Amino acid sequence: MIQRDIEYSGQYSKDVKLAQKRHKDMNKLKYLMTLLINNTLPLPAVYKDHPLQGSWKGYRDAHVEPDWILIYKLTDKLLRFERTGTHAALFG
């Protein structure tokens, strides 16, 4: 099993607090994060995992819910949780 370092951006922590304030089901986010931490790849199709482009090139986007996404970066040595939120909040 690949062992990666795990990082969380400062903005990610703020995004999580906002999601909690909006009464999002944090267990859904935790489960998706656990899949990534445990290297369960590819992710199940329900997460619609895909690479991002433009200014987010090098990052990936997985759907926690239809309009709740997790942006992360995955390399051989690192898993970085960058942002979470709605499409409008993150890409708008």
From Swiss-Prot:
Keyword DNA-binding: yes
GO cellular component: toxin-antitoxin complex
Ranges that cross the membrane: none
GO biological process: mRNA catabolic process; negative regulation of DNA-templated transcription; regulation of growth; response to antibiotic; single-species biofilm formation; translational termination
Residues forming the catalytic site: 87 (proton donor)
EC class of the enzyme, as a word: hydrolase
Keyword hit for Transcription: yes
SUPFAM superfamilies in alphabetical order: RelE-like
Induction behaviour: By the DNA damaging agent mitomycin C.
Alphabetic keyword roster: DNA-binding, Endonuclease, Hydrolase, Nuclease, Repressor, RNA-binding, Toxin-antitoxin system, Transcription, Transcription regulation
GO terms for MF: DNA binding; ribosome binding; RNA binding; RNA endonuclease activity; RNA endonuclease activity, producing 3'-phosphomonoesters
Pfam families, alphabetized: YafQ_toxin
EC number: 3.1.-.-
InterPro entries assigned: RelE/ParE_toxin (IPR007712), RelE/ParE_toxin_dom_sf (IPR035093), Toxin_YafQ-like (IPR004386)
Disruption phenotype: Cells missing yafQ show increased biofilm sensitivity to the antibiotics cefazolin (a beta-lactam inhibitor) and tobramycin (a protein synthesis inhibitor). There is no difference in antibiotic sensitivity in stationary phase planktonic cells.
Its job: Toxic component of a type II toxin-antitoxin (TA) system. A sequence-specific mRNA endoribonuclease that inhibits translation elongation and induces bacterial stasis. Cleavage occurs between the second and third residue of the Lys codon followed by a G or A (5'AAA(G/A)3'), is reading-frame dependent and occurs within the 5' end of most mRNAs. Ribosome-binding confers the sequence specificity and reading frame-dependence. When overexpressed in liquid media YafQ partially inhibits protein synthesis, with a reduction in growth rate and colony growth rate. Cell death governed by the MazE-MazF and DinJ-YafQ TA systems seems to play a role in biofilm formation.
PANTHER family: MRNA INTERFERASE TOXIN YAFQ
Family: Belongs to the RelE toxin family. YafQ subfamily.
Family matches, as NCBIfam families: RelE_StbE (TIGR02385), YafQ family addiction module toxin (TIGR00053)
Subunit architecture: Monomer in the absence of antitoxin. Forms a heterotetramer with antitoxin DinJ, with 2 YafQ-DinJ dimers associated via the N-terminus of the DinJ antitoxins (YafQ-(DinJ)2-YafQ). In this complex the toxin activity is inhibited. Binds the 70S ribosome via the 50S ribosomal subunit.
Entry protein name: mRNA interferase toxin YafQ
